[in-house]
Amino acid sequence: MQRRRFLQLASLAGLSVVAPVGLDGVKRLRAQEQRYDGPMWFFVHAGGGWDPTMLCDPKGVEPINRNYKADQIGRAGAIAYAPIVYNEGAYSNQTFFTKFGPRLCVINGVETMTNNHDTGTVHTWSGRLGDGNPALGALIAGVKAPSKPLGFVSAGGFDKTEGLTSVTRVDNVDVISRIAYPNRNDPNKEADLFHTPDTAARIAKFQRERLDAASAAQTLPALGAVTGRLFLSRTGSNELDLLMQYAPKQDEIRAAPDLLRQAMIAVAGYRAGISVAANLSVGGFDTHGNHDQNQANALARLLTGLDALITYADAQIANNFVVVVGSDFGRTPVYNQQNGKDHWSATSMMMLGKGIRGDRVIGATDEKQLSVGVDPATLAPLPNDRKAKKITPGVVHRALRQLAGVDQDEKARYYPVSGDDVALTLS
């Protein structure tokens, strides 16, 4: 394969890493890094602004909803849920919460302080109201495995890295296989080679030597970073070779539900020790018209996708993963003239996985669907109490950073989250 073609494919797969250091720094990172064996992180974005009253923060009263009454609200352990049925009875909130409730932590009354899509998405997934912070997946990958070629995989949502790691946007195993086996004419045929193994080894040796010489001659940081990116693009192919041992066939990926399809390469990367976090996304939640039907359609895709994702992750990587689900914001407690619901700052988040205590609800909204503050020490809701503190995305991020073991890292301290000091812990 020609070098230019190789780099084009590497770029397509997101492997032209935006390295914050030059070649020497990248080599030091590679020498220090071991196979990643912490939990795999999945951040699932419900794009457009979901309606928690149709999911995990049910109200059962007019004018907030027209779908059910208060005495119809379901319960799975400590978690109350809206009695919504999807796909003509093929799936329901009851199915989801009965199956996963014992492992699930629900956080209601999360105050995003915005009704703007971009601002809400950034706040939910960076922990800061405003620009400047990386996505949480990028931060965790940047601390735990900054030079891994698939450390942070993204299929949508907020995925800014602030240079802490690379971001990979690919769900095509065929593209990755060409990068993993650059000496094969057909990546699926082990003996179909451009060069003999000895010749390929000599070429690789000369390439490394030339890259070392080019790096030694550079004094400008920008050019040094370029050599670092080139080094990562080339040396990453060895780890991608390992990835291919775990990667599903492209036909399997195509046949999977959308949310699972987005995650399958990341799961293979995790099993190979080169993936840390993945952004996943389901759209269709911006329901300004025909809210009840359109929101239900989007929730059906989300919940069936989450079911498939969690089931697949359980089978592939046991309990060594975390799933966090959130949205831009919530929906209004009243319907508009188009039978839709508009933007509302109060929302919910859900999470399950390693280290997270399940069958638990934190926070609340009141009868008007306004976020209720909590006791900053006990987390008990304190309606109309001036001592109460609001749970914001930043408060949730503080707890997630602690769970991930990155809260004390200098990279995390450089990107502080917003919000009050609330003693939220997830374990």
Model-derived features: where do they sit?
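Ligand-binding pockets and gating/stacking loops
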Residues: 1-427
